[in-house]
Structures are given as C-alpha cells and as structure tokens.
Amino acid sequence: DAIVFGCGSPGTMTGLSRFFAKAAPHVELIIADPVGSILTQYVNEGVLSTKSGSWMVEGIGEDFLPDISDFTRVKKAYAISDKESFMAGRELLTKEGVLGGSSSGTLLAAALKYCREQTAPKKVVVFVCDTGNKYLSKMYNDYWMLDNGFLEREAKGDLSDLILRPYAKRDTVVVSP
C-alpha cells in the first residue's frame, strides 16, 4: 500500500515513481527526510526553500532540487531529526537484530509515523538501505551519542557525573610525559 524511502539523489525516487505509476498506481510514495533538508517542505507545501540546515544522518536529504526530480507521485514527506534517526536505528538492532545505518533509522522512524497516522491497516515497505558497520563509532557508540546530545546520562550527584569515561572501564585514555 505504501513504500517509504529516502532521497540522496532523486534518481531512486524518480525511478520508483515511474515504476509504480504503471505497475501499481495505488501505492503511496512516502519520503523520509532529515530535518534540515529542503525536501519535506517542498513535498508537503510546494515551497522550494533556498535555505537548508545541516544534519548528521548520512546519504539522504537535499539542499537543492536536481533537475531530474519528479515528486508528482509523492504523497507526503516526514522530517526526522538526527536523534530520532539514530534512536530508531539502535532500536532496530536491539529489537530485531538488524544492523542498519543512520538513513535506515530515518526511514524506519518515518514509516512508523506514517503507520500511526493511518486509520486502516496497510502494508508498508521500508528498505534497510545502509549497513550499520560504518556507524559503530558513531550512532552505535554510547559515548559519541552522549557527546552529541543524543543520549542522556543519569545524574548521580557525585564525582561520576563529571567523569564520562571511567578509568575502571578502560575507557579513559592516559598519556604520560
């Protein structure tokens, strides 16, 4: 009934649009887009912004609209924050054992938002389009997530609140003169 995908270059979206227009015109095309990209506003409001933000999710999102773009069949776009993307990707690993990358987290988060808005059951396809093996030091690293404000530490009210990487856990790098 629907397919959720991301746009790094609109080639995939244009190809899907043309294919489903002939093969299954009832299938709804939904874009998962990082917050900061111009695509969500363009799809949902028809406004092409000249200002884009920045995002940490890799491989999807646009700061301009390439000439090849054909958004005529796209029903809706969802802007997903970096935190939502990373947390969805981590949840995909812990609950399903699938090591997807950051853009897969964006697609999953958008698909869940789309599904929650529906009033009748639908079949929804989402691709895990990138592997998480290149994100082991990023979205799958708790310290990186903490350093970038995507995870919160529980305050204990003692010195451990100031020491992020305890020596006892062999997480502290010590260099002697």
Ranges and model annotations:
Residues 17-24, 115:
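Surface-exposed amphipathic alpha-helices with a cationic face
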Residues 1-4, 75, 122:
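Conserved acidic residues
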Residues 6-7, 31-33, 125-129:
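Short beta-strand segments
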Residues 2, 98-106, 114, 151-152:
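Terminal helix/beta-alpha structural elements that buttress the NAD(P)+-binding lobe
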Residues 5, 79, 101, 126:
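Redox-cofactor binding/interface segments in oxidoreductases and associated redox assembly factors
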